[in-house]
C-alpha cells in the first residue's frame, strides 16, 4: 500500500506532540526536578490536572478521605471552607459527565448556569450555600462501579440509617416516618413487637421509599470513555490484555538498547537504531516461540527487504489495526503513554543525548513507536484469530471513536448486559452512584424526605448532588488546604515584621548559601548561634554556568540549570604532578579489580567460582555495612588513608588570552568538542577552557548585586554549595542541587570564590564601583545535606592575618550544622524525641553510610514557600525547613530589573521542585516511583519494579511521605503594582502565575502588609492571627515534635540570651528549659502598630 506524503507528515507531527506528554526525566545521574505536566502548562492548573487524570488515569488531587482526615485534625478549619466557597464556589470546575435534563429541576430554571446561593435546594431544605458547606465537611464512601452493584444488591445498605446520621437527625427521621406512614404505624403498635423493633422497621420503610424515589429519577450514568486502542476493546470484551504480551518484549528491547555498559553483551546493530536492531534481532535471529508471536519474523523480514522507514511502519501498523485516520493522534498518544517511562527515556535520549551516562544511543521516539505498533499488530491478529476466528479483523471489535458506537460481538454472542440478573439491571437503570450519594445526604442533611417523593424535587436534589460532585469538592478542599498554610505564613510575616523591625548588627562574616529550603534551617541555626553573621540565599550555581571536570571525573559535566548550555570549561588541576601520577595509578588499579569482578559475573564459565570466592569475600563488609553502617564507613576511610592521598589541586578558571576552544585533553583530561560536536554530559561544543577576566567580574558583580550584598564586607565571605552523599541510593542526584541540573554545587561555589579573590577580577570590579579590599577573602564550601558535614576549599590560600577570623567562622558553622542535624532528626521515627545534638549528628552520618536505609534524607520534602526579599525581614522566623529563601534588596532595585531576573529564575526552579513532589505525593504510583523496596537499576538510566516493569519516574514514596502537596507560594518583597507589571510583561512568569501553577504574594517593602494575587490583581491579605509562639531558640520549639510546625519567633537570632528571655514580662515557660522539653516557651511580646518601618539593612 502506498502511503501519501501528507500521512507521513501527519504521523511525524503526531509523534512530536505526543512526545511532549511523556515524562521529561533524564537518566538517574542527571535527575533534575521538573513539572511532570510541563506539556500542559499552557492550561490552568485545575484543567491540566483533570486532563492528565483522564488521559493517564492518575489522581489530580488528594482523595476526599485524605481531606476528611485533614478536617478532623484541624489542618483545614471550617473558616477555610467558608472562605473558598465564598470566593471560588461558583467557579470550582465543570461537572464531568453528570448533567440532568434541563427543565423541571427545582431551584434552577431552564438556561440558568448556577443555583442561587441563598435559594433552597428543595422546599424546607438547606440553601445551596448551606448544602455545599455541609457537603465539604462530610466524607461519604460511595461504592463505585461493580462495587456499587454488590453493596446494594442485597438491600442491606438501603434499610439501615447511615453512620453519619446524628442522633437528633435519627429521631427526626423517625418523626418523618410516623407522619408519612401514620396508618401503618397505628397497626404495628397492636403487634407484640418491641418498640425498638417497630421504630427500626419504620425507619427501614422510610429509607426504602426514599431510595426508590431517588433511584427512579436518577439520570443515566455517564458513558464510558471511548476506547482509543484495539487493546482496550480486546480487554473489555474478552478480558485479554495484549499489553501483557507486548510490554515484556518492548521492555527488554529498550533496556538492551539504552544500556550504558552494564550488560555483558551489547545489543547487535545498536548503532543503527532501535527499529533496525529489532528487525535484525527478531527477523533474522528468530522471534519468540509463543503462539501470539506467530508471523512476527516474516513481517520483520519483509520490512527489511522493503527498507521501510519508521514513519512508514507506523502508518502501516495503524492501517493494519484499522484505526480511522481521525483517531490516529489519540491512538498514538495512548500507545506511548501505556509504557510512558520507557517511551519518555527514549525521547530523552533523542532530545538530550548529552545526558547519557556514558554513550548515547541513537534513539528516536518514532523508532520506538514503530516497534511497539508492529508488536501490537502481530499480537492482536493472533489473539483475535484464537478468540473469534481465523478471519477476524480488528474492525470486528467495533469502531474506535466517540461513545454510542456499535458494540463489538463477543465470541459467545452475548453482551455484558446479558450477564446481569434482572435485579442488577434494574439497579443499573440510573446513575447508581449518584442515587446512593443523594440517598445518604438526604438522611444526613435537614431535608423532609416526603418532599423528595415529588419528581420535581427529587430531580432538584439529585441535580444539587451532581453539581457538587467529587471533582468540585476535592478542588475546593484543596484550595482550603492551601489557604490554611498560606494564611499561617502571610500572618507570620506580618507579625514578625511588627515585632522585629530593627536592623541586624554589623557582620563578623557573611555566608552565601543556595536558596534550597534545606539550607533554611542551617542559616537559622547559624544566626542563632552567632548573631553577628549575615546569611544570603541565591541560585545554587551562583551564576557560574560551567562544564566542570574534577580530578576524579572521566569527562566534564554541566553544572548549571538544565535550560542553559555552558560555554566554559573549568578543570581541577593537581599542583604536584608526581602526586597526581601516584594517585591516578592507585585509582586505576582499584578500578581494574572492580572491572574484573564485574566482568566475571556475566561469564557463565566464571560465575560459579565468582559466587563462591567473591561472595564469601563480600559477606563480611556487607554485613558490617548493614549492622554498623557508620563504623563500617569509618573503616573504609581508614583503609583509604593507606592509599596515596588525593593531591592538592586548584581550579583553572582563567581563559587564555587567545580564547582558543579546548578541543582535546590539553593535559587536563578535558574532552571538549568542536562547534556542533556533542560533548557527553555537557551539550554541543565548543568549550573554552576558563572564563575571561571581564566575564568573571560580571559573574561576581551580578551575584553580589542580586543578593543585595553591598557596603563593607566582613573578613571572610563564605560561598557554600551543596549536595548529598548516600549509598545504595539510585535517586542520589535528586537530592543534589537542582540549579546545577542534578549535580553538586560545591565546585560552583569554589569557582565563584576563586573569581572573587582573583586580583585582576577585583581590579575590574573596582572600575565598576565595587570595592573588595585586601581584608576580605572569599572561601568556597560544600554542605552535605545528608551527613550534615561542611567542607571548605583552598583554605591554604587564606592570608595569614585572616586565619583567626576563618577559624572563628568555621567553628560557628560547625555548631550550626550540628544543630541542623538535630532538627532533621525530629522527622526520623528511628530517632528518639530527646536525642542530643551530638548524637543526632552521628545518627545522620550513619544514615548516609547505611546500605539498607531507604530514607537517608527527605530532600525537598515539605517544600511549600519561596520568599524573595531581605533576610533581615525573615531572620529569627522559624519556617520549618519549608521555604526557599532568595536574597533580594528592593531598595537597590529602582526599576525592578533584578526582581524580574530573580522571578524568571527562582520561580520556575522552585515550581519544578514543588510540582515534582506534589504529583509524586498525590499519586505515588501514577506520577511517583512507588516504594524503593522493589526497585532495580537498569542500564544506569532508571529503575524498574523488579526485573521487568515500566521505568518508574518521579520521586520514591520514601522521599515524599511527609510532604504536604500544595502549590508553591512565592512571596516577593515588592510593591503590588510593580509585581503585577512584572507578571504582565513576562509571558513565562505570567503563565505560571495566572495559570495557577504557583501562588504569588507581594510583601510591602515599607510595611507589614501582604497582598495575594488573585484573578489578575492583588488583593490585600487580612491577617487572622498575629500572635505566634516566641521561643529562645529553635530547638525549644521543635523538640519532641514529629509533624509540621507553624512559624514562630526565635529571639536568639537577634542576640538575645535565654536569661534575657526569662526576664521578659509574660513568660509562660522558662525559656532556658532543656531542648528535650517539647515546650513552646510562649513569650508574648506587645504588638506594634502597622505602618512604615525604620530604614532596614540592605541584607
Swiss-Prot record:
Zn(2+) binds at residues 514, 516, 722, 737. GO terms for molecular function: zinc ion binding. Residues 175-194, 1071-1099 are annotated as: Disordered. Residues 176-194 have a biased composition (Basic residues). It is a peripheral membrane protein. It is found in: Cell membrane. Its main location: membrane. Its cofactor is Zn(2+). GO terms for cellular component: plasma membrane. Keywords: Cell membrane, Membrane, Metal-binding, Transport, Zinc. It holds the Pfam family DabA. InterPro entries: DabA. It comes from the Bacteria. The keyword Signal does not apply. Part of an energy-coupled inorganic carbon pump. Belongs to the inorganic carbon transporter (TC 9.A.2) DabA family. Forms a complex with DabB. This is Probable inorganic carbon transporter subunit DabA. It comes from Parafrankia sp. (strain EAN1pec). The gene is dabA.
Amino acid at each position: 500500500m502506498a502511503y501519501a506524503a501528507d500521512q507521513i507528515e501527519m504521523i511525524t507531527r503526531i509523534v512530536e506532540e505526543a512526545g511532549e506528554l511523556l515524562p521529561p526525566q533524564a537518566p538517574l545521574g542527571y535527575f533534575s526536578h521538573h513539572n511532570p505536566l510541563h506539556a500542559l502548562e499552557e492550561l490552568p492548573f485545575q484543567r491540566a490536572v483533570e486532563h492528565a487524570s483522564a488521559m493517564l488515569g492518575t489522581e489530580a488531587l488528594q482523595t476526599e478521605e485524605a481531606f476528611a482526615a485533614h478536617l478532623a485534625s484541624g489542618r483545614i478549619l471550617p473558616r477555610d471552607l467558608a472562605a473558598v466557597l465564598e470566593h471560588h464556589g461558583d467557579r470550582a470546575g465543570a461537572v464531568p459527565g453528570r448533567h440532568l435534563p434541563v427543565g423541571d429541576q427545582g431551584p434552577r430554571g431552564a438556561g440558568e448556569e448556577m443555583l442561587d446561593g441563598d435559594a433552597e435546594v428543595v422546599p424546607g431544605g438547606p440553601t445551596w450555600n448551606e448544602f455545599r458547606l455541609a457537603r465539604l465537611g462530610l466524607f461519604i464512601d460511595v461504592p463505585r462501579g461493580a462495587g456499587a452493584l454488590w453493596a446494594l444488591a442485597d438491600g442491606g445498605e438501603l434499610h439501615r440509617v447511615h453512620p453519619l446520621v446524628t442522633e437528633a437527625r435519627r429521631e427526626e427521621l423517625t418523626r418523618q416516618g410516623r407522619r408519612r406512614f401514620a396508618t401503618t404505624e397505628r397497626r404495628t403498635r397492636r403487634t407484640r413487637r418491641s418498640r425498638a423493633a417497630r421504630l427500626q422497621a419504620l425507619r427501614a420503610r422510610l429509607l426504602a421509599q426514599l431510595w426508590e424515589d431517588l433511584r427512579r429519577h436518577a439520570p443515566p450514568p455517564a458513558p464510558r470513555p471511548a476506547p482509543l486502542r484495539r487493546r482496550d476493546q480486546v480487554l473489555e470484551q474478552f478480558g485479554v490484555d495484549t499489553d501483557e504480551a507486548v510490554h515484556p518484549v518492548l521492555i527488554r528491547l529498550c533496556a538492551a538498547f539504552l544500556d550504558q555498559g552494564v550488560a555483558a553483551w551489547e545489543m547487535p546493530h545498536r548503532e543503527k537504531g532501535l527499529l533496525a536492531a529489532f528487525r535484525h534481532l527478531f527477523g533474522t535471529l528468530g522471534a519468540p516461540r509463543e503462539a501470539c508471536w506467530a508471523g512476527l519474523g516474516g513481517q520483520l523480514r519483509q520490512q527489511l527487504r522493503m527498507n521501510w522507514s519508521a514513519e512508514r511502519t507506523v502508518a502501516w501498523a495503524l492501517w493494519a489495526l484499522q484505526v480511522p485516520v481521525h483517531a490516529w493522534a489519540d491512538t498514538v498518544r495512548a500507545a506511548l503513554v501505556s509504557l510512558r517511562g520507557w517511551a519518555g527515556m527514549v525521547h530523552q535520549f533523542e532530545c538530550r543525548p548529552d545526558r547519557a551516562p556514558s554513550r548515547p544511543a541513537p534513539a528516536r521516539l518514532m523508532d520506538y513507536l514503530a516497534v511497539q505498533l508492529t508488536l501490537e499488530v502481530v499480537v492482536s491478529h493472533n489473539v483475535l484469530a484464537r478468540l473469534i476466528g481465523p478471519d477476524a479483523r480488528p474492525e470486528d471489535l467495533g469502531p474506535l471513536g466517540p461513545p454510542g458506537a456499535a458494540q463489538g460481538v463477543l465470541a459467545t454472542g452475548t453482551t455484558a448486559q446479558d450477564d446481569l440478573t434482572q435485579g442488577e439491571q434494574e439497579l443499573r437503570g440510573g446513575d447508581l452512584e449518584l442515587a446512593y450519594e443523594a440517598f445518604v445526604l438526604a438522611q444526613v442533611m435537614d431535608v423532609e424526605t416526603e418532599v423528595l417523593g415529588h419528581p420535581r424535587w427529587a430531580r432538584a436534589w439529585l441535580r444539587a448532588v451532581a453539581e457538587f460532585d467529587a471533582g468540585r469538592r476535592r478542588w475546593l478542599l484543596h484550595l482550603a488546604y492551601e489557604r490554611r498554610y498560606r494564611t499561617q505564613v502571610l500572618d507570620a510575616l506580618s507579625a514578625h515584621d511588627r515585632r522585629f523591625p530593627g536592623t541586624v548588627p554589623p557582620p563578623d562574616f557573611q555566608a552565601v548559601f543556595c536558596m534550597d529550603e534545606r539550607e533554611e534551617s542551617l542559616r537559622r541555626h547559624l544566626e542563632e548561634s552567632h548573631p553577628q553573621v549575615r546569611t544570603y540565599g541565591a541560585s545554587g550555581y551562583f551564576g557560574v554556568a560551567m562544564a566542570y571536570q574534577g580530578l576524579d571525573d572521566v569527562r566534564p559535566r554541566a553544572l548549571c540549570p538544565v535550560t542553559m548550555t555552558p560555554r566554559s570549561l573549568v578543570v581541577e588541576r593537581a599542583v604536584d604532578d608526581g602526586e597526581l601520577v601516584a594517585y591516578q595509578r592507585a585509582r586505576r588499579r582499584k578500578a581494574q579489580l572492580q572491572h574484573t569482578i564485574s566482568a566475571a559475573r556475566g561469564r557463565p564459565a566464571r560465575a560459579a567460582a565468582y559466587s563462591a570466592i567473591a561472595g564469601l569475600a563480600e559477606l563480611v563488609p556487607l554485613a558490617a555495612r548493614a549492622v554498623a553502617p557508620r563504623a563500617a564507613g569509618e573503616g573504609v576511610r581508614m583503609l583509604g588513608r593507606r592509599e596515596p592521598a588525593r593531591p592538592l589541586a586548584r581550579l583553572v578558571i582563567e581563559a587564555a588570552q587567545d580564547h582558543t576552544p579546548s578541543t582535546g585533553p590539553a593535559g587536563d583530561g578535558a574532552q571538549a568538542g568542536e562547534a556542533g560536536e556533542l560533548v557527553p554530559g555537557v551539550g554541543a561544543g565548543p568549550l573554552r577552557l576558563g572564563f575571561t577576566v571581564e566575564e568573571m567580574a560580571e559573574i561576581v558583580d551580578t551575584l553580589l548585586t542580586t543578593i543585595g550584598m553591598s557596603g563593607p564586607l566582613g573578613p571572610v565571605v563564605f560561598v557554600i554549595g551543596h549536595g548529598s552523599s548516600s549509598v545504595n541510593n539510585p535517586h542520589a542526584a535528586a537530592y543534589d542541587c537542582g540549579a546545577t541540573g542534578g549535580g553538586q554545587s560545591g565546585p560552583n561555589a569554589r569557582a565563584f570564590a576563586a573569581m572573587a579573590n582573583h586580583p585582576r577580577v577585583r581590579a575590574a570590579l573596582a572600575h565598576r564601583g565595587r570595592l573588595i579590599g585586601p581584608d576580605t577573602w572569599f572561601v568556597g564550601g560544600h554542605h552535605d545535606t545528608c551527613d550534615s558535614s561542611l567542607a571548605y576549599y583552598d583554605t591554604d590560600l587564606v592570608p595569614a592575618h585572616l586565619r583567626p577570623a576563618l577559624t572563628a567562622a568555621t567553628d560557628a558553622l560547625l555548631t550550626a550544622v550540628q544543630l541542623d542535624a538535630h532538627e532533621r532528626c525530629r522527622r526520623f521515627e528511628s530517632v528518639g524525641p530527646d536525642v542530643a545534638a551530638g548524637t543526632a549528628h552521628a545518627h545522620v552520618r550513619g544514615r548516609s553510610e547505611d546500605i539498607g536505609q531507604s530514607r537517608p534524607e527527605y530532600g525537598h520534602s515539605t517544600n511549600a514557600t519561596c520568599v524573595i526579599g531581605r533576610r533581615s525581614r525573615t531572620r529569627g522566623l522559624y519556617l520549618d525547613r519549608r521555604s526557599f529563601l532568595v536574597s533580594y534588596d528592593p531598595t537597590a532595585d529602582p526599576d525592578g530589573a533584578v526582581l524580574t531576573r530573580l522571578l524568571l529564575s527562582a520561580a520556575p526552579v522552585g515550581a519544578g521542585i514543588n510540582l515534582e513532589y506534589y504529583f509524586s505525593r498525590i499519586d505515588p504510583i501514577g506520577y511517583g516511583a512507588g516504594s524503593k523496596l522493589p526497585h532495580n537499576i537498569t542500564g544506569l538510566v532508571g529503575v524498574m519494579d523488579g526485573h521487568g516493569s515500566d521505568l518508574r519516574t518521579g520521586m520514591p514514596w520514601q522521599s515524599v511521605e511527609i510532604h504536604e502537596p500544595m502549590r508553591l507560594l512565592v512571596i516577593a518583597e515588592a510593591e503590588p503594582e510593580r509585581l503585577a507589571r512584572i507578571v504582565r510583561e513576562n509571558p513565562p512568569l505570567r503563565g505560571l502565575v495566572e495559570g495557577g501553577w504557583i501562588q504569588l504574594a507581594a510583601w510591602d517593602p515599607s510595611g507589614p502588609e501582604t497582598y495575594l494575587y488573585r484573578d489578575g490583581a492583588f488583593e490585600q491579605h487580612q491577617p487572622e492571627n498575629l500572635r505566634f509562639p516566641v521561643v529562645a531558640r529553635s530547638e525549644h520549639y521543635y523538640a519532641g515534635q514529629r509533624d509540621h510546625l507553624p512559624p514562630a519567633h526565635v529571639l536568639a537570632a537577634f542576640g538575645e540570651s535565654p536569661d534575657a528571655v526569662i526576664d521578659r514580662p509574660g513568660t509562660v515557660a522558662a525559656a532556658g528549659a532543656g531542648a528535650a522539653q517539647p515546650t513552646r516557651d510562649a513569650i508574648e511580646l506587645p504588638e506594634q502598630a502597622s505602618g512604615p518601618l525604620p530604614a532596614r539593612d540592605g541584607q
